Design a protein with these regions (language model features):
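Alpha-helix N-cap/helix-start and coil->helix boundary motif
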Residues: 14, 45, 64-65, 189
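Short, solvent-exposed coil/turn linker segments
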Residues: 27-30, 100, 188
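Alpha-helix/helix-capping structural signal
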Residues: 42-43, 84, 187
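Generic beta-structure capping elements
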Residues: 10, 23, 118, 175-179, ...
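Single conserved hydrophobic/aromatic residue that forms the stacking wall/gate
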Residues: 182-185, 189-199
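Small-molecule-sensing regulatory modules
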Residues: 50-184
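A conserved helix-loop-strand patch within extracytoplasmic ligand-binding domains
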Residues: 1-54
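N-terminal segment of the mature folded domain
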Residues: 1-2, 86, 194
Length: 199
């Protein structure tokens, strides 16, 4: 983030999972051997190949509409996208399947809209705090701390998802896809979870 700016608030998180949209099939298991799957995310590539090493990964660029159009034109057999982006655009793609986090863990902050303002604009910060979603903020802080401690970025094969369950326990899953090391913690405080995971 540029110096002088900061995240002032975050809105309530949309579903953070990934979605697989297929041309003719309906899910990851039924894709034909060697099917062409479109994604340019190293995180998604590592995880999908862990489940289906036979798949052929092809680079996928452009906005969501362009990506789906290229799928249905036959350039791909399936594509991987963030479910939140598809939902926010009101798109209901055919032959789609929301992937469980046990199959593909999302990127840190996936599904979250953050509002940024100047660090010296105290008045704006106070205004924006009124629309801040505290649970989402705690989760995002944990995920971003995990990513930062590993020296990761949006181009790193690192996944992280924090959330509260129905009993208000704080849950955290982290994944380093290079070594496929899966870290999990069940704690009550976001900062404690991060410390435990990074020890």
């Amino acid at each position: 983030m540029p110096s002088g700016l900061q995240i002032a608030c975050v809105l309530k998180r949309e579903n953070p999972k990934d979605i697989l949209i297929c041309n003719t099939e309906k899910n990851l298991k039924t894709l034909k051997k060697g099917a062409r799957v479109g994604t340019s995310s190293v995180r998604r590539i590592a995880q999908v190949l862990n489940v289906r090493p036979d798949l052929k990964i092809k680079s996928l660029r452009g906005n969501i509409g362009t990506r789906i159009k290229n799928l249905y034109s036959g350039k791909y057999d399936a594509i991987l996208l963030a479910l939140a982006g598809v939902k926010r655009l009101g798109i209901i793609p055919r032959n789609s399947n929301t992937l469980p986090i046990s199959t593909i863990l999302p990127a840190a902050g996936q599904g979250v809209i953050a509002v940024v303002c100047r660090k010296n604009d105290v008045q704006m910060q106070r205004i924006l705090r009124n629309i801040n979603h505290l649970d989402t903020e705690k989760c995002v802080v944990a995920e971003r701390s995990f990513l930062a401690a590993l020296g990761g970025s949006c181009q790193s094969p690192i996944a992280a998802l924090a959330r509260f369950n129905s009993k208000r326990s704080f849950l955290f899953d982290g994944l380093v896809s290079v070594s496929y090391t899966h870290l999990r913690a069940h704690e009550t405080e976001a900062d404690l979870v991060c410390r435990l995971l990074l020890e």
